[in-house]
Each structure stands twice: as C-alpha cells, then as structure tokens.
C-alpha cells in the first residue's frame, strides 16, 4: 500500500468546514466558574499587600487568590524537552502568581466568580500596595554596570545568556581578520563596514485567545483542557508549579485556533489548575482578552544587530561579525535558545574566507516576555545578514545577485556547530532562476539611473532554515500504535496538530507502514 505522497482528504477537514470541530471553549461543562487575572499597574517593584474588602462584596465572587497564596515553586515556561544536562535546562524564573513584579501587567492575583462580569468587576476593585522601582526598559539600561538585576536569585546581572560562536579558527575574532587581511592586501583592495540593524517586537495575533478550563476529579487528578501546542510539556511544568507529582496532572488539547509559537509556551495552565484546586475541584474557566494576550503572553524578540563586514574590492567576503542584543522581557521563556539560533543561522549563509564571529546576548528587561514565534530567531538573522550583504555589495559597486553567487554556501559545507554536511544546497541555481524569471539584470540596470522622490527598485535576499536541537539536546521522537478489536488502529504521538496537517500526514505514514487502511487509523 503506497499512500504516503498521495492526495488524501485531511482527517480534520469535515469538522472544520462544517463547524463541528470542538475547540477548548466548546467543551466546557455547564455551571463552570470563571477566573480573571489581576495584573500589576507598575512595571518593576514588589507587592506589599492587598485590600480585598470591596472585591469580596461583588455578588457572585467565590474566591480571590493572590501571590501570597500560591506554592513557592518556580518553573520554566519554554516548550522544550527537559534536557538531562543542567546548563541546557530551561530557566525556572517565575511562579504561578508573582510578588516580585517585573513588567507592567505581571500576574499578581486572580478572582474566581460565578460569571465573567462578576470576576472582572471584582478584579478592578482590588487595591494593591507596591514598593515601586525604576523600570528597566531597554537592553542598554539592563546591561549597564549599575543596573539592578530583575532576577537577583538567579543572576547577578540581567544577561540571561551570552552565546559566543565562531566559524574558521575556534578563537577567531573579527579583529584577527582585519590584521590578517591587512597583511595580505593593500588598504585600497579591502573595505570594512560597520552597520546597525534592528528588528521590532511582533505579536502573534492568533484568532483563538489563550483559553483553558480545569477541574479535579474524585481521585484527586487535575485535568486542564487547553489550547496549547505542547500538552506534554504543559503537564510537566504545571506539576512543577503546583509541587505535585506529574502523574496527578492530565492535559487535554482539543482543536487549536492558531498559535504560531505563542502557545508553544506554558501560559495560564498552571494558574488555572491552581484555581480549580482552590475551590475544591469545581471546574474553572480562564480566558484572557486580546489586550492581555498582547501585553502578557509572548512576542517575537526585538533584537539589535551590530554588524561588521570585511570584503575585497573584487567581491569576496573575508570576515563578518554579529553582536546581537535580544530584549527578552521579564521572563526567560525560550529566549536563551532563540538569540543563539539567530547567531547560528547568521554564520551559515555565507562562506567567509577568514572567519565569522558571533556574540549573542539575551537580556531581561521590564517589558513583555519574548518567546517562540514563527521561524525561531531566523527572520532576525536573515535581516541582519542580508542588510549587511546588500551594504557590502553597494560599497564595492557590485550587483547584489552577483555578490551572493560569489559568496553563498555551496554543497559540501560542513556546519561547525553540529558537523552536518550540506549535501543538497541548490541555492545558486535558485538565485540564477529567480534572476532570469524576473529579468533582474534589465531592471537592476535601468532602475539605478532614476531620480526623484518616488522610484522603482528590485531587491533579493536569501536565508537558510535549520531545525532540531542536536548537539545541545537529544533528538528523540516516538509513537504508539494500538490495534483495536475491530482491526482498526489508534495512533498516539506527541506531535500537535495546529493547522499544518500533522494528523493527516502521520495517519498516512501509519497506514503505509502497517498496511491498515487510511480511514481505519484514528
């Protein structure tokens, strides 16, 4: 049976086009309680006390919990497998609710009520006394010598991680490249450029807001139904946050209305679990607003890239350097991995004859936490690399296509980070085909002679995408297939269907491997 590669109907198609597909909010039971998060109104400081008197007078309020009530357990939120090597484990830097405020809108308390309106009214009536500190908004302020650490129990400064990478000699520096080039070429034969480029924060803007509901069954097992990309990791982190065995926690992931990496983080599931435990196991629903999602969940990293490039007048890149400074916000999330991934990809695009030097700094600030977002640091790397490439080509007056063809990676390149050889690159052919298809040479020549405030132009860029965590962590994958009594098969795996067609593709793979019909795999 050869079904892989064949056109089949998606296994989730009917439910999605008819509206029968059930998302998290569609599955909640009747008479469910509603939670509302109380957020800090300062960006940096300490919660001293709460006055809950007026809030408890709102009809329908069942319980109010604060940062003084939650377990004293710090946990990570990144959607990574738990590394066996301690230095590569995700950073445990937050609690279910935080007394130490690190951003405007930090989670400090929560209201449980009979309906959403009562919960929201009570949340607005809670009075909070703070000890306020000066916010640390920029990377420059966070890295200043006199900057106060936002996580003094974990770091003596605000640098989450500094990743140093080179290509060429292991101790290569850009300054070494300058010296070596100076001894091989005359000053009129080489050009050294220094440029600075920035990328902004971006919100994921998925249609379905972060939503979950939770309950405790008669055996004391905590179940959280959540719109998440990482149910198994949410299970581990929720147990860690509550201080209970993992076996007591169950996570159910229904259909997901978009995530794009924001839901590859543990968001409000631990709080939701704590809320249901606080009311004797009654089901509690917790959905945050669009405003809360943008300010309080995750964003793409804003990264400042300070770049240097050394090139010969005939168009050969000799050396490049990237100093990347990532504004990670208040909590670590995926940050320690994303900026490093950005640096890794920067050095993989071009073959610098003398070498490449990369330093990546991921920094805590008093701002929304940055985490996973589509392509995981690679858009920033491509922006830095391609802006620098265009500027180098412009500095020597060379066509950008020609410049890239002369310097881009080719078949046989060995990535020094993991030893993987590039056996099928095809990049040069891609550039040449694109060049021919859009009539690049003709347009490049004619557009260069324009004047005036409004002009036409053509541009091009390349990038590479790498995936996986080797050699930092083990690459593992597994699935379980259960043969049912009627000859059909139940397929169980950790991969999450989030619109990309994973359930359909894995069903095809299971069908072809076992010989069981495609429509008999569930």
Predicted feature locations:
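Short, surface-exposed loop/turn segments at secondary-structure boundaries that line and modulate
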Residues: 65-106, 141-154, 233, 250-272, ...
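Alpha-helical support elements that line or immediately flank enzyme active sites
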Residues: 37-71, 109-130, 212-280, 337-348, ...
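General beta-strand structural signal in soluble alpha/beta enzymes
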Residues: 19, 63-67, 103, 193-197, ...
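Short coil/turn connectors at secondary-structure junctions
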Residues: 31-34, 58-62, 98, 105-108, ...
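Flexible, low-hydrophobicity surface segments
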Residues: 1-161
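Flexible, glycine/charged-enriched surface loops at secondary-structure junctions
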Residues: 134-140, 398-407, 441-455, 518-522
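Helix-loop-helix junctions that connect adjacent transmembrane helices in secondary transporters/permeases
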Residues: 148-242, 408-488
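Glycine-rich loop/linker segments at domain edges
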Residues: 6, 12-15, 86-87, 158-212, ...
């Amino acid at each position: 049976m050869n079904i892989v590669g064949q056109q089949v109907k998606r296994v989730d198609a009917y439910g999605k086009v008819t509206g029968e597909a059930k998302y998290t909010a569609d599955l909640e039971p009747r008479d469910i309680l509603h939670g509302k998060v109380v957020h800090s109104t300062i960006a940096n400081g300490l919660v001293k006390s709460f006055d809950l008197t007026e809030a408890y007078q709102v009809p329908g309020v069942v319980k109010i919990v604060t940062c003084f009530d939650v377990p004293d357990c710090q946990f990570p939120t990144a959607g990574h497998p738990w590394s066996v090597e301690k230095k590569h484990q995700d950073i445990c830097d937050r609690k279910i609710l935080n007394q130490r405020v690190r951003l405007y809108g930090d989670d400090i308390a929560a209201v449980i009520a009979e309906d959403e309106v009562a919960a929201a009214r009570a949340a607005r009536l809670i009075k909070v006394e703070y000890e306020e500190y000066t916010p640390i908004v920029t990377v420059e302020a966070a890295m200043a010598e006199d900057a106060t650490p936002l996580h003094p129990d974990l770091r003596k400064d605000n640098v989450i991680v500094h990743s140093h990478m080179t290509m060429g000699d292991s101790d290569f520096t850009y300054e070494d490249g300058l010296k070596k080039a100076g001894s091989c070429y005359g000053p009129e034969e080489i050009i050294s450029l220094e440029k600075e480029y920035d990328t902004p924060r971006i919100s994921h803007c998925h249609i379905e807001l972060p939503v979950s509901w939770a309950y405790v069954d008669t055996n004391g097992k905590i179940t959280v139904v959540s719109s998440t990309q990482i149910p198994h990791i949410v299970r581990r982190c929720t147990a860690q946050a509550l201080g209970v065995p993992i076996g007591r926690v169950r996570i159910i992931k229904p259909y997901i209305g978009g995530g794009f990496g924001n839901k590859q983080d543990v968001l409000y599931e631990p709080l939701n679990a704590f809320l249901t435990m606080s009311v004797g196991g009654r089901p509690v629903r917790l959905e945050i607003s669009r405003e809360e999602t943008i300010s309080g969940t995750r964003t793409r990293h804003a990264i400042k890239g300070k770049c240097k490039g050394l090139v010969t007048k005939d168009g050969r890149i000799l050396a490049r350097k990237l100093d990347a400074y990532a504004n990670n916000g208040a909590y670590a999330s995926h940050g320690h991995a994303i900026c490093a991934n950005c640096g890794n990809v920067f050095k993989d695009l071009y073959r610098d004859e003398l070498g490449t030097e990369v330093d990546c700094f991921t920094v805590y600030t008093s701002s929304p936490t940055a985490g996973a977002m589509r392509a995981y640091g690679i858009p920033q790397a491509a922006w830095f690399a391609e802006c620098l490439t265009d500027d180098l080509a412009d500095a020597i007056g060379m066509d950008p296509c020609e410049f890239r063809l002369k310097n881009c990676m080719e078949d046989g390149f060995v990535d020094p980070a993991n030893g993987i050889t590039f056996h099928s690159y095809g990049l040069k052919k891609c550039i040449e085909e694109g060049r021919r298809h859009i009539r690049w040479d003709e347009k490049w020549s004619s557009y260069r002679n324009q004047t005036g405030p409004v002009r036409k132009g053509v541009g091009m860029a390349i990038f590479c995408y790498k995936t996986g965590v080797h050699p930092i962590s083990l690459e593992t994958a597994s699935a379980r297939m259960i043969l049912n009594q009627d000859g059909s098969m139940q397929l169980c795996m950790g991969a999450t269907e989030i619109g990309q067609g994973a359930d359909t593709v894995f069903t095809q793979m299971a069908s072809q491997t076992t010989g069981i019909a495609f429509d008999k795999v569930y």
